[in-house]
């Protein structure tokens, strides 16, 4: 029988903690596939903080860390400076990277820290009930914007 699919080596052989239909599992799997194709898995320091993105360290076989809520860029900065040969990858949600943790994200970028930040932007605080976040589009109805959001969103990638 021809093998048409196999688990990428950097993904742990564990059940996913993510909800059915959620994109986190696919995003993390895609990241692991790219890291494996680049042959840098041994150099990876995979990090995150609160929220669903923090579960990503349980399904990968990378050296990993979780930080206090919204402080992943600050913790990662210290890790990178102490281990300059490491490849530091942060997996954060929009609430973590662009709302509550925007200051840490912005200042790490402004300092030119050698970090890779992957932001899973679902435009809401998904884990706590679907409240509007800083990236929620104008007009979007959430549990806290029943008439539609009136606040222009932050475009983190810009």
What are these regions (language model features)?
Residues 126-132:
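Glycine-rich, charge-decorated loop segments at or immediately adjacent to ligand/cofactor-binding or catalytic sites
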Residues 2-68:
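Active-site diphosphate/adenylate-binding microenvironment
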Residues 24-27, 33-40, 81-84, 110-113, ...:
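Generic secondary-structure signature for well-ordered alpha-helical cores
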Residues 6, 133-158:
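Conserved thiamine diphosphate
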Residues 17-21, 91-95, 140-149:
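Flexible, glycine/proline-enriched loop segments at strand-loop-helix junctions
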Residues 52-126:
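Thiamine diphosphate
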């Amino acid at each position: 029988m021809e093998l048409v699919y196999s688990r990428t080596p950097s993904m742990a052989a564990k059940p996913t903690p993510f909800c059915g239909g959620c994109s986190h599992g696919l995003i993390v799997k895609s990241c692991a596939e790219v890291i494996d194709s680049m042959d840098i898995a041994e150099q990876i320091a995979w990090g995150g903080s609160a929220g669903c993105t923090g579960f990503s360290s349980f399904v990968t076989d990378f050296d990993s860390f979780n930080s206090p809520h919204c402080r992943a860029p600050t913790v990662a900065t210290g890790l990178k400076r102490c281990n300059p040969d490491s490849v530091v990858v942060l997996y954060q949600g929009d609430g973590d990277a662009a709302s509550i943790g925007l200051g840490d994200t912005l200042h790490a970028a402004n300092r030119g820290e050698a970090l890779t930040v992957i932001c899973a932007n679902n435009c809401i605080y998904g884990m706590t009930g679907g409240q509007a976040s800083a990236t929620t589009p104008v007009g979007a109805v959430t549990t806290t914007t029943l008439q539609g959001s009136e606040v222009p969103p932050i475009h983190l990638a810009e």
